[in-house]
């Protein structure tokens, strides 16, 4: 990844490093530019850090008002995404984690160094920049979970002092409490994941019942537990005084575009943002604010509460009334005018919106230059604004599929992607498969819908196969036919034998690489799905009592042969007779 080409903001915030659109690391920084750049400008002592840097394909930034906001957001996003590298790198060394061991009668411990983060031996929560020991003590008091090093496989002659202090139920001695103990461990984990509401409601019901039964001692215990749980929630969720689902919605119109940024708060914690834009070209509306708001929430779930700029309160008044009447669950709309937490979050949303707008126009200029370079260097008749790219995926001709990805103005247009299951059976090879898919795609496509460029993943052989079909169909003139050979990233133009070689750091080449890689990814995913179904079907065909209907039911419920292998007899019996379930267990090893 060329970090020099990324416009990194110089403010506090959180960065999400990604590979294949999956978050692999979440970090925070007082100055994002300094922190993120430091990953790329030197060789690190830690092999894991070097490995992380090699795997970074994209970085997303989330700007915050303060470093504390960044810290809170980082913790929430780590819990949301469980990124691969977060528990392995040095960034968390100064922050303790809470570890719940994976063993009979789990223990709770504080761990501080990365060396102790062995995910096979336990589940980790954190990092906690402050209050970890207090939190652990509260949890022990609430759930009576042990924190000792005693061997739980043995029975001790007597419990330790903590049993008599009522901060442990003594599993080292009393083995018959296992079921209740495990339930307490699960409740403890839910609290650490931020899910306190359900447990508080359960304890409130128990407290009220105990009070009605005149068992005031038990009622007081429940009351104190509720107080402690609320204390945990408030220390973790300091953004708000209460738990709620809320969107902080801001937008800005520039020329013929509306840019939208929404901070998503769920259960009182900010868990991410949604950034998008709406094309306003040739659109007519009496109230642009209503149109933008309704356009966004026609595709997204409307939360219980929304925060919007006070500037738009009058313009959105009709929307507010309509949504309040239409939805049986009352919606809350907030238009903060004075300094408050909601106003701070609104400012944070605007900060991210400005960043999104800057990034959009910067990227748009870069892409536009790339499109122009492709047109000029390759001598194309049209600017390559719409590209359809084809890739073939198979293993020695088996489970062969083709995929088509689409790029419009240099950006992926995923709604237009297509996949094809190859039909030709006679000595299938990549060339004949390419001929088949090109014919299926373009034989009936109206001339007006042809793309500017048809891009083939491959070299001269593949491009000539595609050209033969388009020529026979009399449609070779409708699009530029090009191919991208993966080995040296050479670009072939139909009718020419000498390839074009572009500099690897040119946006022109990257436009083709992105759409080619998308076709490859899309095709591989489809190929694996087809192959998996075939393997499952062939395995199940060996078993008496399984026909087409039962095979389909098993596939629908379990999805893979390994999942069927792992399923218990009871789970299998839900859809097939016990005799057939036993046959599956005996024959599928």
Curated annotation (Swiss-Prot):
Residues 197-232 form the UVR domain. It comes from the Bacteria. GO terms for molecular function: DNA binding; excinuclease ABC activity. GO terms for cellular component: cytoplasm; excinuclease repair complex. It is found in: Cytoplasm. Pfam families: GIY-YIG (PF01541), HHH_5 (PF14520), UVR (PF02151), UvrC_RNaseH (PF22920), UvrC_RNaseH_dom (PF08459). The UvrABC repair system catalyzes the recognition and processing of DNA lesions. UvrC both incises the 5' and 3' sides of the lesion. The N-terminal half is responsible for the 3' incision and the C-terminal half is responsible for the 5' incision. This is UvrABC system protein C. It comes from Fusobacterium nucleatum subsp. nucleatum (strain ATCC 25586 / DSM 15643 / BCRC 10681 / CIP 101130 / JCM 8532 / KCTC 2640 / LMG 13131 / VPI 4355).
